[in-house]
Amino acid sequence: MIIAIDGPAASGKGTLGKRLAHHYGYRHLDTGVIYRAVAYALMQSGHDLRDEAAAVAAALELDPEKFGDPALKTQKVGEGASIVSAIPRVREVLVNFQRQFAADPPGAVLDGRDIGTVICPHADVKIFVVADPKVRARRRTMEAKARGEAADEAAVLADIIQRDERDKNRPIAPLKPAPDAYLLDNSQLDIEGGVRAAIDIIEAVRAGRSRG
C-alpha cells in the first residue's frame, strides 16, 4: 500500500507521515528532506540556489545516510529547498528515487507537496493536510526555539505565506490537492488528533476496497 501525504510548509505532514508509517509498519520518506539536502549542499559549496547545473549535480550525488542531519531542518535550508524544488531538471532527477522508494513492498508513506499528483498519482490513499498559516507559523517558531534557534513568529509567518505562493504557482508540479485526495485540516488538532483522523481515512478506504 502507498499512502501519499501532501500539504504546505509546516502543516504537520512530516510528523503525520512518520507516525502513520510506524503505525502500519511501512517505510517513511519525507521527500522535502531530499530537496533540503540539495539546497544544503549548494549552500555548503557556495553555489547560488538557482544555479541549475550545480543543483542537478548535487541531486545526483545525494547520500541518503545524511538525510537525518539536523542542519537540514533549519529555516534557512527550508527556504532554499523551496527555491531548488522549482528547478525542473532537479525535480526530474529526484522523481525516480521517490517512485522506486514507494514501489518497494510491503508499503510506504511519502509526504511532500506533489506525491498524490505527480510522484504517486495511483497511491492507494491520498491525504492533503492543511492548517491556518498563523497556526503553522506558531508551530514552526516553537520548533525552532526548541532547537535553540532564534525565531520571530511574524517573520516566520511572512516566509510561510511567501513559500505557499511560490509552491502553488510554480510551473512544474504546483502545490494542490489531487482530485481524489482527502482533506485533513489540523488547525485545531494536536498530533494525536491528526494521526487518528488520518487513520480513520485510511481504514475507511481499506474497508471500502475489501467490500468491493
From Swiss-Prot:
Protein name: Cytidylate kinase
Any Gene Ontology CC annotation: cytosol
Any one GO molecular-function label of the UniProt entry: ATP binding
Reaction it catalyzes: CMP + ATP = CDP + ADP; dCMP + ATP = dCDP + ADP
InterPro entries cross-referenced by the UniProt entry: Cytidylate_kin, Cytidylate_kinase_dom, P-loop_NTPase
Cellular compartment(s): Cytoplasm
Gene Ontology biological process terms from the UniProt entry: nucleobase-containing small molecule interconversion; pyrimidine nucleotide metabolic process
Cross-referenced Pfam families: Cytidylate_kin (PF02224)
Binding of ATP, residues: G7, P8, A9, A10, S11, G12, K13, G14, T15
Organism name: Bradyrhizobium diazoefficiens (strain JCM 10833 / BCRC 13528 / IAM 13628 / NBRC 14792 / USDA 110)
Predominant location category: cytoplasm
